[in-house]
Amino acid sequence: MSAEQVLDQGRLIVFSAPSGTGKSTVAKLVMERLGSLEFSVSATTRQMRAGERDGVDYHFLSREEFEKKIAENGFIEHEFFFGNFYGTLLDKTIDAIKAGHNLLFDLDVKGALNLKRIFGDQALLVFLKPPSMEELARRLQARDSESAEALKSRLERAEMELSHAGEFDFVVVNDDLGRTVDAVATRIAEFLPQP
């Protein structure tokens, strides 16, 4: 079955943004507002953070399990960064789309662009920009969960990700949460098939 045949039954919405931009919050609020989206849960080898649940926030896999799935072509996309693997499980995605679900993904820039390359116009790429690099640095420091070196790496990665914003279908600066959610929800509602 081709990607086009599967996707005639559901749509893909992909959120990307530098870490600390608020994409998880925006995604959650947009999902609550629209009610017609199902969150695609990514797999990862990173350690579970406080409050996270396996199968809800991520599918937490051992490195060995993840590498086995890579060898079996079990991912739509996967990435290795900051010492951990992240990926989108092919079987879970296909099952949800076949069931007619519209899936929302939280992916890095490379993963988003890979997904768009595979699924074309059936995928809508949404990029959230921070108000400024200074504000992004402040938000990341407020998390107090990373070393100075990791923070520096995240900020460098953010600059790279921001350079790809023009490759996305819809770009919005997250400087006001309410306005951002309104704009993103409106664009997604226009993209989804009408009943």
Curated annotation (Swiss-Prot):
Compartments, record wording: Cytoplasm
Gene3D superfamilies the record matches: Guanylate Kinase phosphate binding domain (3.30.63.10), P-loop containing nucleotide triphosphate hydrolases (3.40.50.300)
Keyword Nucleus: no
InterPro entries for this protein: GK/Ca_channel_bsu, Guanylate_kin-like_dom, Guanylate_kinase, Guanylate_kinase_CS, P-loop_NTPase
UniProt cross-references to PROSITE patterns, sorted A to Z: GUANYLATE_KINASE_1, GUANYLATE_KINASE_2
Domain Guanylate kinase-like: 10-189
Keywords linked to the UniProt accession: ATP-binding, Cytoplasm, Kinase, Nucleotide-binding, Transferase
Pfam families per UniProt: Guanylate_kin
Catalyses which reaction(s): GMP + ATP = GDP + ADP
Molecular function as annotated in GO: ATP binding; guanylate kinase activity
GO-annotated cellular components: cytosol
Record-listed E.C. numbers: 2.7.4.8
Binding-site residues, ATP: A17, P18, S19, G20, T21, G22, K23, S24
Function: Essential for recycling GMP and indirectly, cGMP.
Family, per entry: Belongs to the guanylate kinase family.
Protein name stated in the entry: Guanylate kinase
UniProt lineage: Bacteria, Pseudomonadati, Chlorobiota, Chlorobiia, Chlorobiales
UniProt gene name: gmk
